[in-house]
Regions:
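Active-site glycine- and acidic-residue-rich loops that bind
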Residues: 28, 67-76
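Hydrophobic, small-residue-rich alpha-helical packing segments that form membrane-like cores
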Residues: 1-63
Length: 134
C-alpha cells in the first residue's frame, strides 16, 4: 500500500473511533481497496462516474451519491444502468455537488433533477424517493 492510502485508512479509523459518519471521496480506488474502506466504516461515496462503477459500489454495500451539478453531471450515466439492472435504489441519492448559482437560476435545483429522472422514464414516486428520501 502507498502512504496516501494508508493515511486514508487511518483517517477512517479515527473518524469511526469518534463515532462520526465516514463519507467517501474515492475516485480512483480499486475494488479491493473499496471493500477495505467499506469494512473499515465508510458508508457513502460520491465518486462514481459511470454505471459500472456505481453498480460495483452498490453491490459492495455502499450508499451511492450520484453527482448532478455544474461540474460533474453523472445522473444519466450512473442511474440508467442501475435502473436497467433492476437494482434496489434505496441506497442511491442524487446530490448537487458544485452547483453554480447561475445554473440554479437557469435550470432549477431539485426540480431539475426530478424532471431529468422523469425524462429518463423513472416513475414519479421512485424519482421522489431517490432525490428526497434516500
Amino acid at each position: 500500500m502507498d502512504a496516501e492510502y494508508d493515511q486514508l485508512l487511518q483517517s477512517i479509523d479515527d473518524t469511526v473511533a469518534m463515532h462520526k459518519s465516514v463519507q467517501g471521496h474515492m475516485p480512483a480506488v480499486t475494488h479491493p481497496q473499496l471493500m477495505e474502506c467499506l469494512a473499515a466504516g465508510l458508508n457513502t461515496d460520491h465518486e462514481a462516474f459511470d454505471g459500472a462503477d456505481a453498480i460495483a459500489r452498490l453491490r459492495a454495500g455502499c450508499h451511492v451519491m450520484i453527482r448532478e451539478g455544474s461540474v460533474a453531471r453523472s445522473l444519466k450515466d450512473c442511474l440508467q444502468p442501475i435502473l436497467d439492472a433492476g437494482m434496489d435504489t434505496s441506497r442511491v441519492s442524487i446530490i448537487t455537488d458544485d452547483l453554480h448559482t447561475v445554473d440554479v437560476v437557469r435550470r432549477g435545483h431539485m426540480d431539475d433533477i426530478v424532471r431529468t429522472m422523469l425524462s429518463m422514464g423513472v416513475p414519479l414516486c421512485k424519482a421522489i424517493q431517490i432525490r428526497f428520501i434516500s
